Regions:
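Single conserved hydrophobic/aromatic residue that forms the stacking wall/gate
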Residues: 1-8, 12-15
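Surface-exposed ligand/attachment interfaces on beta-rich extracellular proteins
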Residues: 24-26, 67-75, 171, 175-177, ...
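Short, structured beta-strand segments at or near domain termini in extracellular proteins/domains
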Residues: 31-41, 149-163, 174-175, 212-217, ...
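Glycine-rich, low-complexity segments
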Residues: 36-50, 57, 165-190, 280-289
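Acidic glycine-/aspartate-rich tracts in secreted/extracellular proteins
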Residues: 41-45, 55-58, 87-92, 100-105, ...
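Extracellular/periplasmic metallocenter environments
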Residues: 51, 90-93, 115-168
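N-terminal edge beta-strand
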Residues: 54-77
Length: 296
C-alpha cells in the first residue's frame, strides 16, 4: 500500500506496479531491482467516541473525546462499527442523532439506539434520553453510505458532517491535531493521516495502546524527505534520520507516548497533508534493534 492521494480522509490506497512501465523513473523499469515492504493494518474498523456538549462562546456544540474543537468533520469507514457514548451529563438535554442532512432526516441503516442497556426505537431513544443513565448510539456504516451528519434532535447547529469512506480508517482525537487512523494493535502497526497545523509540538493519536518505537513520515501534498523518528535501542533516547539521505542521525525530544506520536521532524509546513507508518514492538512477533557493521 502506498499513499496515492492527498485527501486527508484517505488513509491509504493501493497502487498497481507494472513491470517495464518505467513510471517516470520511479518504479518497475526492466533489469532494475526493487524492494517492497507491505503491512496489513486490518480489514475492519471500529472505535468508541465519548461525546460531550461544550460551550463555545455561548453556543453549545458536540465534542468527541474531549477534543476542544467545535463542529469537527468525522471520518468513518464503510463496514466499520462505531459506538457513540453520551453518558456525560452535559448531553442530558441534547439527544445525539445521525441523519442525511444537518439538523434533520434521520438515518436508519446500520444504527441501533440503547438507553440503560436496552435497545430502543428512535422515538423511544429521544423521549427517554434525558432520564437515562447510560446512552449509546451504535452504527455499522453500510457500503456506499452517503455523507452523513450528526446533530441534536432538539437544538439546531450543534453538530457537523460525517464522511463515510470506502478506505479504512477513522477519526482519532487523542492528540493536539485530529487525525485519521487505521490500526492493527495485534501486529503493532498503525497508519496515521493528518494535516499539519500552525503550532509547534503537534501530536496525533496512533491507536496502538502502547508507546511506539519507530515512525516513518512523508508529506503527501508535495515533495519532501522520508522522515524517520525512532527510539535508539542503545540508550532509549529519541533520534531521527531520513530514509532518502546519508546524513547521520540527529537527536530530538520525546516523540512517542502510549496514545500519541509527534509530527515528523522536517516533514511539512502548515497545511501540508502527511502520512505516517507507526510501529510498536509485539512480544513474540516483532522486535526493533540496531547493529554495527564490521566491513565484512
Amino acid at each position: 500500500p502506498l499513499p496515492a492521494s492527498s485527501a486527508a480522509s484517505d488513509v491509504y490506497k493501493r497502487q498497481t506496479m507494472t513491470r517495464g512501465s518505467n513510471d517516470g523513473g520511479k518504479c518497475c523499469e526492466d533489469t532494475q531491482t526493487y524492494v517492497s515492504w507491505n503491512w496489513n493494518a486490518g480489514n475492519t474498523d471500529g472505535k468508541t467516541y465519548v461525546v460531550k456538549v461544550h460551550d463555545f462562546s455561548g453556543n453549545n456544540r458536540y465534542i468527541f473525546d474531549d477534543f476542544q474543537t467545535e463542529a469537527v468533520t468525522l471520518d468513518l469507514a464503510e463496514g466499520g462499527t462505531y459506538i457513540f457514548n453520551m453518558d456525560d451529563s452535559s448531553n442530558a438535554s441534547h439527544p445525539f442523532s445521525i441523519g442525511t442532512a444537518a439538523n434533520g432526516t434521520v438515518y436508519t441503516s446500520g444504527i441501533t439506539y440503547f438507553l440503560d442497556g436496552v435497545s430502543k426505537t428512535y422515538s423511544e431513544y429521544t423521549l427517554g434520553f434525558s432520564a437515562a443513565t447510560t446512552r449509546r448510539l451504535h452504527i455499522t456504516v453500510p457500503a456506499s453510505a452517503p455523507v452523513l451528519y450528526y446533530w441534536c434532535s432538539v437544538h439546531s447547529g450543534m453538530g457537523g458532517q460525517i464522511n463515510t469512506n470506502s478506505t479504512l480508517g477513522s477519526s482519532n482525537f487523542d492528540g493536539t491535531l485530529q487525525s485519521t487512523v487505521k490500526v492493527n494493535a495485534t501486529a503493532g502497526f498503525s497508519i496515521v493521516s493528518y494535516t499539519v497545523g500552525n503550532s509547534s509540538g503537534m501530536t496525533m493519536g496512533h491507536g496502538l495502546g502502547v508507546s511506539p518505537v519507530i515512525a516513518i513520515s512523508k508529506k503527501r501534498s508535495g515533495t519532501s524527505d522520508w522522515s524517520v523518528q525512532f527510539v535508539n535501542p542503545s540508550d532509549n533516547s529519541t533520534d531521527y534520520m531520513f530514509l532518502n539521505k546519508t546524513d547521520a542521525k540527529g537527536d530530538t525530544s520525546t516523540y512517542f507516548t502510549s496514545t500519541t506520536v509527534k509530527d515528523g521532524f522536517g516533514t511539512g509546513a502548515n497545511g501540508d497533508t502527511i502520512i505516517q507508518y507507526v510501529f510498536s514492538e509485539v512480544a513474540g512477533y516483532s522486535k526493533f534493534g540496531s547493529y554495527t557493521g564490521n566491513g565484512n
